[in-house]
Regions:
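Flexible inter-domain linker/hinge segments
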Residues: 267-270
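Trp/Phe/Arg-rich N-terminal binding region typifying the photolyase-homology
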Residues: 1-41, 143-265
Length: 270
């Protein structure tokens, strides 16, 4: 079975972009030979133009979702994540985002607490479903796994644009890079709180959560860190999550976010 390994640099500089872009070009040439079909660079450029427009429209939708109640479920964010990673360069997906923009305008103003979610969404977990599925008091307005790259891409240099997008993805490099990007997202959407779900075994998420907490503390945004299994419901312990989440939401409702939120995190061993 043919296998291709892309060596993605951590450094964000022109030499790194050139290095990865050349790998992508070599991979494209290999695909041409494997499939017996010529590569059409103009189609790639067209897809990048659509991707740029889709990303802008998605941020427009996120801003509207921070203003209006838009009934949905936690799993909806995972569907959106799949679309952003598998269909972002297609006109059909851009049309879907534009439809959602017009649709959300018909819904009432949201008066509850706005949540920015970080990392995996355990959509099957009972307590999380209770508080975030079609709940007019608490609404997840966006998740970092949906828009893990915020770069405007240059369609005139498609391979370099793709290389730069990969290098600047929030999951590449140190966690401080992710913390800065989440901070930019928070500055745009103005959430009332951030919740990060640390999946068991994901050392990057667990180890870097303190860096993100410090970043958000500087922005006066309370943060809750939850631990659990984001994939296998057999390892889901609803009681612990229920206790910590309800205490955090009660703190948000009381309007004393930063001080009590810090105490809550310290009490949980974070």
């Amino acid at each position: 079975v043919p296998f291709t390994f892309l060596d993605v640099p951590y450094r964000d500089d022109e030499a790194s972009v050139d290095y990865l872009a050349q790998q992508l070009k070599d991979f494209t040439a290999e695909l041409e030979k494997r499939f017996g079909r010529p590569f059409d660079e103009e189609k790639l450029k067209a897809s990048i133009r659509i991707e740029n427009e889709t990303r802008k429209e998605l941020m427009r939708f996120f801003r509207l979702q921070s203003e209006r109640y838009y009934p949905g479920e936690m799993i909806s964010h995972l569907y959106m994540m799949m679309g952003m990673h598998l269909m972002i360069g297609r006109q059909e997906f851009l049309d879907l985002i534009r439809f959602m923009i017009e649709d959300i305008k018909t819904y009432p103003k949201f008066e509850g607490k706005k949540i920015l979610w970080i990392h995996l969404l355990p959509f099957y977990q009972e307590t999380l479903q209770k508080y975030f599925n079609t709940n007019q008091k608490y609404q997840i307005i966006a998740s970092d796994i949906i828009i893990d790259s915020m770069e405007e891409m240059d369609p005139s240099r498609p391979f370099h644009a793709l290389a730069r997008k990969i290098i600047r993805n929030l999951y590449n490099g140190s966690y401080s890079h992710k913390a800065e990007m989440v901070g930019r997202l928070a500055e745009t959407l103005h959430p009332d709180a951030v919740i990060q779900f640390c999946h068991w075994g994901c050392k990057q998420s667990s180890g870097g959560s303190v860096l993100l907490k410090e970043k958000l503390k500087d922005m006066n945004i309370p943060m809750l860190i939850l631990d659990g299994d984001g994939i296998d419901r057999r390892n889901s312990h609803d009681g612990q999550i229920k206790t910590r989440l309800e205490a955090f939401l009660e703190m948000l409702d009381a309007g004393d976010g930063e001080e009590e939120g810090t105490e809550l995190l310290q009490a949980s061993g974070r």
